């Protein structure tokens, strides 16, 4: 990018009055032609909540939760897919394809459907049914591959080369991280350009954390922020090749995909170099969390913030919690945790994390018994009676 030129075209004052509340409000920082229309679905400008109750529980001064699960297909991946659709439009493509553990697939299918494009989606057979249902609803041709994500990726790569489809795979298409970087641009604008100490995010193939870091560096280059935050790379213990590389100082090696957090279960990360560079350049922290810690974070976010994240979506928050418990985050720190996907994408694991509802017949005595059996007492709330007022006409 020509940052000197961008400085003449984009100012904080211009952004403040811009009405486009989507990722495309930052067009000057995005690699698209001026004449290229933004794709139909409104992606981005997701809410940033100040999570005071959760911050208090974790023992830190300020915590913000960026809920990217409210995007059109319910994940941060919509940012990459919106960019992919825009670039496919520029290329005159009518068919787009990708491989995915779930979120990138549903994201591409939805964004492409809105733009009138055909999609071919390759998913590993373990992909949650909720995500596959999204694909089918959006009219995608879905190929469920009986194998690992690595095998799924290789098959999609061969098919794309054979039939000449536009490639949305993150490792192949460099524009996708440019779409994902908008989450970082939004965080900083929503914080009124005040830089947090840390940004915590879940990591799978590495494209998201690499994009986040690129966006922050762009803002620093044009003078919108005066320093850069440290990144927190959170991975599942059962699949953490990138974090393990940082911890050991050795090159990354493939791992088995052994975690319920399907969206980050990537044993062979395709954006490893960019992700590792982002973590190292930011002097970032790495943390690996168990499936049990991930499920606990689902409950914690839901009950303190009202945010419902899928397992992979809350892994950043789970990692932050673990680091706080280990004393690695200072009590006066300001932290942003990015929730990358909505919990409705994986209802089965949400139920496993939070339990089943109380099931009884329509009987008050049975209700009281159920409360007592669960160690609960029904709250007694006395409502203040308000006298009726006479109406005069």
Where are each of the predicted segments found?
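PLP-dependent amino-acid enzyme catalytic core
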Residues: 1-393
